[in-house]
A protein has these predicted regions:
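Membrane-interface "cap" regions at the ends of multi-pass membrane proteins
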Residues: 1-42, 46-51, 65-70, 81-82, ...
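Hydrophobic transmembrane alpha-helices that form the core helical bundles
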Residues: 43-46, 66-159, 164-167, 311-331, ...
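C-terminal membrane-solvent junction of multi-pass transporters and transport-like membrane proteins
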Residues: 147-150, 162, 341-353, 387-438
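Helix-loop-helix junctions that connect adjacent transmembrane segments
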Residues: 2-3, 8-16, 51-55, 132-150, ...
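Membrane-interface loop-to-helix entry segments
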Residues: 122, 150-201, 215, 256, ...
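A generic transmembrane alpha-helix motif of multi-pass inner-membrane proteins
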Residues: 199, 377-383, 412-470
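Helix-loop-helix connectors at the membrane interface of multi-pass transporters/channels
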Residues: 1-4, 90, 118-150, 187-190, ...
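TM-loop-TM module centered on a large, flexible mid-protein loop between adjacent transmembrane helices
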Residues: 87-88, 94, 126-136, 212, ...
């Protein structure tokens, strides 16, 4: 009989299974559609210089994350435990790798995602209230210029408020997420419909044509994939709620795959409309592409309403990141592999209050220090290292545990994880070359966790649970 998985504590009843298939799909869509699709088209357009290449980057990104979704669906169904990849990596590659993922997620991925979404929310506010972007002071630290605006403290307050909301029950959180997801998908469909009906009347110019593919073009595509991957990020987070999903062996794979396909379709349609309605140069220069599209179609009043809807969308994604992210340090602390306070649960609501306060505090500090673009580049590099490791863990588990019960098996194995691994390696290497300082910071956070692992791994509780041995 196989040994207990990391974080295999479902018999304790610590967490509540209160999320059905509808809530799970809403979480995937709501977590994935945050601020990215409304904002990053300009970054991608500047990177590749062609509307066609922007769309190709979105399609490539969708294909890559679909391969990853198949991997996460198999592992999530096989190990429906709190912590997601913390469990998969610990079982497939060994306790150190599971721990380093949890460390990276707790100190970098989730706090940065929270801060980025809050910064995106404030960026939408700036469209309605330009005073939000008013510089307060600036300073030079080495070769880096730091500008502090009113946006940073506002983003910090948003992080604190959403973290506080997540003290409430899982079922309530699922219902809220269904509502917010319906609003954001409805908003995107309205943009698409308006662009299809009225877009050709407003298109001012065509984008530069593609004359040939070269190494420079491929490098530009990889650069454009960085913001696209930020926009697609979220499909992988559902597994963190494995102990709170009803019939997880069935519902985790369905929700991940169906949710991601829906997101990809919406993203492609929205970006087609962006370039249909606006001249390419305006898309490349605009910090608020979606708002500019709606303003072109319906005037300033329509753009204002869209901006409010996009701000709500960012809040919805922020809610999911907090909801799912807190389960990772909670699962680690429960296994004796994190700070003990992160194991604390609310006595009646059964929410991981210690982990919530921990993540919220780090995210609030990050929100004070960086802008939207600076934060997501730091985030993507570290996350995609572990995406590649999850693909390796899937292959290793197929080899060393062939009899493991797998309610869902990844389509196209072994090519699915191999191609996903290759894509993850290409993306991280390119990002290191393009943004070496921020990539180095991300890697440094990961490496910093190693001495903590060897300190905590000596605890009796950690030695028996996390190694995955009989």
């Amino acid at each position: 009989m196989l040994a207990s998985n990391p974080s295999d504590h479902s018999e304790r009843g610590d967490l509540v299974r209160g999320l059905g298939l509808g809530s799970a799909i809403a979480i995937v869509i709501g977590d994935t559609i945050g601020t990215g699709v409304f904002l990053v088209a300009s970054d991608m357009a500047r990177a590749v210089g062609s509307a066609t290449l922007v769309l190709i980057a979105w399609i490539l990104g969708l294909l890559i994350v679909l391969l990853g979704a198949f991997c996460y669906a198999e592992l999530g169904a096989a190990f429906p435990k709190a912590g997601g990849p913390y469990v998969y990596l610990g079982r497939g590659l060994g306790p150190l790798w599971g721990f380093l993922f949890g460390w990276m997620s707790s100190f970098l991925e989730r706090p940065v995602a929270m801060a980025t979404l809050a910064a995106g929310f404030v960026r939408f506010l700036g469209f309605l209230f330009p005073i939000v972007a008013t510089p307060l002071f600036s300073s030079h630290i080495g070769g880096y210029e730091f500008t502090f605006t009113t946006a940073q403290p506002i983003a910090t307050v948003i992080v604190v408020m959403v973290t506080a909301v997540n003290y409430f029950s899982v079922r309530m959180g699922g219902a809220i997420q269904v509502l917010l997801t319906s609003l954001k998908t409805g908003t995107m469909l309205v943009i698409v419909a308006g662009g299809v009906v009225f877009g050709t009347k407003h298109a001012g110019s065509t984008a530069p044509a593609i004359t040939s593919f070269s190494l420079g073009t491929i490098g530009a595509l990889l650069t454009a994939l960085v913001p696209a991957m930020w926009a697609y990020n979220g499909f992988n987070d559902l597994g963190d709620l494995g102990e709170e999903i009803v019939q997880p062996q069935k519902n985790i794979p369905r929700a991940i795959i169906f949710g991601l396909l829906a997101v990809g379709g919406l993203y492609l349609m929205a970006n087609l409309v962006y370039f249909l309605v606006l001249p390419f140069a305006q898309v490349a220069a605009s910090p608020h592409v979606a708002s500019d599209v709606v303003q072109s179609l319906s005037g300033s009043r329509g753009a204002a309403w869209l901006t409010v809807a996009m701000a709500v969308s960012a809040l919805g994604a922020l809610h999911v990141v907090v909801l799912t992210g807190a389960r990772i340090p909670y699962a680690m602390a429960r296994d004796g592999l994190f700070f003990g306070f992160a194991e604390r649960l609310h006595p009646s609501l059964r929410t991981p209050t210690g982990a919530l306060v921990f993540l919220g505090s780090i995210a609030a500090l990050l929100a004070l220090t960086g802008t939207f673009e600076e934060l997501y580049s730091l985030f993507v590099f570290a996350v995609w290292i572990f995406f590649g490791l999850v693909a390796i863990a899937l292959i290793r588990l197929r080899q060393k545990e062939p009899n493991l019960v797998r309610p869902y098996r990844a389509w196209g194995y072994p090519w699915t994880p191999l191609v996903f691994l290759a894509a993850a390696m290409a993306l991280t290497v390119n990002l290191w070359m393009v943004r070496p300082v921020r990539s180095s910071l991300g890697l440094g956070v990961i490496v910093l966790g190693i001495p903590f692992f060897y300190r905590w791994h000596k605890r009796p509780r950690a030695a028996g649970i996390h190694c995955g041995r009989n």
